[in-house]
Amino acid sequence: ITPQTRALFIEPISNPQMIEIDVEPYYILSKKHQLLTIIDNTFLTPYLSTPLEEGADIVLHSATKYIGGRNDVLAGVVTVKDERLAEQLGQFHNMIGATLSPLDSYLLQRGLKTLHLRIDRSQENAQRLAERCRHSESIDEVLYSGRTGMLSLRLNKAFSVAKFLENLDI
């Protein structure tokens, strides 16, 4: 942290390592240095984590991933803790013209209705997949936090990524 630092940007679950961190010490550090805390909550979603209630000032979501849920909308969501931030970001938002169409807004609203079901199912599937991959000779390491539907794999050097993907049955 330097005198020029204005904010801490935190991914509670890193990508692609899938390492989950305890964000509480960062909230304390931010308050101590009067910094904004910005959380990228894309992997956890509002269903699994509510950073504004935990101490964050700004929370970001890639709505394209879980919130939309059907790969038919490209969007992001920014939520803020207080009116001052909302007004500042709202002015910026208007200046750059970053608004969703009515259809994209509808698609995100539709996605929110089933978010809890999709998150629960993706967690179950990811846990089962992670367990199976841990026993595969072609995989050296499974990178999985245990809390989301996302995981990463490190293939054994003797195995080709292209061949692995070609033989993957979904």
Regions found by a protein language model. Give the residues of each.
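Conserved C-terminal alpha-helix-loop-beta "cap" of PLP-dependent enzymes
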Residues: 147-170
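Conserved PLP-enzyme active-site core in the AAT-like
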Residues: 1-138, 143
